[in-house]
């Protein structure tokens, strides 16, 4: 039974989508004014892993993730770079696709943009005004926070506590325009030099929170199965989305709320963020680290937990990933000398491991326990590859199951164009052990396996050297 931790109720709940077998999932996407950093990518990877697991479990997932292409930060960046808002956003949307593709994040069913949905945003705000949940003030439109009686139900914030801190979050001009300090902007009056659209309230642009309410309900319906994003979006962004959407439709906005943990950096485990200037972009990291290693590093921590970014943790991910790939290479190679038939006992034991994997992953996508099962699978591949007699059907059965499970983490051995250096070193070490133990059959197998991958070995008095046969 698949259970999710629902932030709305602060407990694990049995997952039952509105329509059996089909899942609607909305993930808050990036504001496209710069390259994404590792913290941004964590959200994309975490929810891609969850999506992959849902699909593995047989669900059809309609996965929508937006691009915020109108925002104060984008306008500021366009002015600093002397580029149009459109030029800035196109550049960094393309960069986002390149970076996430390198990390093997599946493309969303749809990536809607704010600019493309402006008419719907304006209509949505008009309904809120007509229903008395919003009001115009000097060209701005604000949401009446107190009118929505369930405000705070996601984050646990109390209206009285919010009121005490409201003055510290808004400037004096906003205070003068608002009927209540807690009200938030749905539409902002145009300022000189800013991009704007015509509306019933004059020229302006949407506030941040309204866009996700509009695009999620437009493309997925009034009630979504899963709404997801970073923990920093829980309040006020997701809280405001609920207020806007449920005021308009009168229906529950999202049934399950999932929030991923931060990526931290440094000795004090600070949250990685652009505002703190302590970030590492995926664009830069990809120049130094294999993308599969980055993906594995981020996809093997349970989504609600923080991840500590460090060279040591990346290296650990690389070592573990190489072990998984080596196991795959070892058993794949034995297809050459395998015989027809199968080994039922081996296949049953491996099938039981897959059941163990499902059991732990069904517990709120516990990838840390899940990857432990995968390591045991890799161990069993190595054990079987060492057998004197191996069966073709069993090898194919084990490899297909193994690949199917590993691909949930975004790792695809079939797409590897060449072996990682560490994988080569590991195979050479295994070959040296085989030679030491006078297991020359295994030693020759590893040599031939590497040769097929274009790796030439040279045994010297100082040890085994290798080079790529380009």
Curated annotation (Swiss-Prot):
InterPro entries: Cys-tRNA-ligase (IPR015803), Cys-tRNA-synt_Ia_DALR (IPR015273), Cys-tRNA/MSH_ligase (IPR024909), CysS_C (IPR056411), Rossmann-like_a/b/a_fold (IPR014729), tRNA-synt_1_cat_dom (IPR032678), tRNAsynth_Ia_anticodon-bd (IPR009080). SMART domains: DALR_2. Disulfide bonds: none annotated. One of its GO terms (cellular component) is cytosol. The keyword Ribosomal protein does not apply. The keyword Magnesium does not apply. This is Cysteine--tRNA ligase. Pfam families: CysS_C, DALR_2, tRNA-synt_1e. GO terms for molecular function: ATP binding; cysteine-tRNA ligase activity; zinc ion binding. Keywords: Aminoacyl-tRNA synthetase, ATP-binding, Cytoplasm, Ligase, Metal-binding, Nucleotide-binding, Protein biosynthesis, Zinc. ATP binds at residue 274. A motif ('KMSKS' region) lies at residues 271-275. HAMAP family: Cys_tRNA_synth (MF_00041). A motif ('HIGH' region) lies at residues 30-40. Its cofactor is Zn(2+). Binds 1 zinc ion per subunit. Monomer. Its EC number is 6.1.1.16.
